[in-house]
Amino acid sequence: QSRKDELKGTIKLVFQPAEEGHAGAYHVLESGLLDDVSVIFGLHVIPNLPVGVVASRPGPFMSAAARFAATFTGKGGHAGVPHDAVDPVVAVSSAVLSLQQLVSRETDPLEAAVVSITILKGGDAYNVIPESASLGGTFRSMTDEGLAYLMKRIREIIEAQAGVNRCAAAVDFLEEELRPYPATVNDDGMYGHAKAVAEAMLGEANVRVAARSMGGEDFAFYARRSPGAFFFIGVGNETTMGPAAAVRPVHSPHFVLDERALPVGAALHAAVAIEYLNKHDCS
């Protein structure tokens, strides 16, 4: 704020609301608040880098990601006479195994993709075949096209396996409640700009090339609207990253961050924005 009158343009600060799963960035864009934004930059804490280190990469950085749920409906019955029932548990099991082939047999091995079944529910009695059973999970790809292909095939496989096993299947991709995220793709120019500013501020050795990540990130919605760059910022230290420590990921209840990273991130955000305005005079 003390340098507000020196800015050669406008800087908007965006706290990412509902970033985890509910596509907050999509709704921020829908509000129109960022319609006049030329470029955008973002930071995300990362525990396996120390304070004072940032990392990113040009081009595709984080995966497109989505969720799915499916319910298989058969005919319940006594487990001792399975021929009088239509077993949805067998149908679910067949679908789980068939879905594994999407990555191993239908995805180019040089392209990253994930299909993980993380929810499996059936009956609640040892001697009863349930009327229905369900599964759910996540699927990811480093491209939006790859995600669309996986979505199409997941539906086809689930419906086909249900049919083979005489069941009906309902597939839900939760697109309103948990909107799929596109891939996070860093613009080459914006990545280069942010990298140069970070190197001048932190030193070249402290600005690293990050590996691609299969994590999903709603910054991707912003980066599709305006050229952008997204960076990881280290929040680890000798205690959280030391020989006796197990680095706790950001979604762990045991995650700990070194708050000395906060002023580093704030300063980097400010410097990246101010230097961009100085070079492009957006006033």
What are these model-predicted stretches?
Residues 3-130, 217:
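Histidine/acidic-residue-rich, glycine-tolerant segments that coordinate divalent metal ions
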Residues 1-2, 277:
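Structural signal for the C-terminal ends of transmembrane alpha-helices
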Residues 90-283:
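Metal-dependent amide/peptide-bond hydrolase catalytic core
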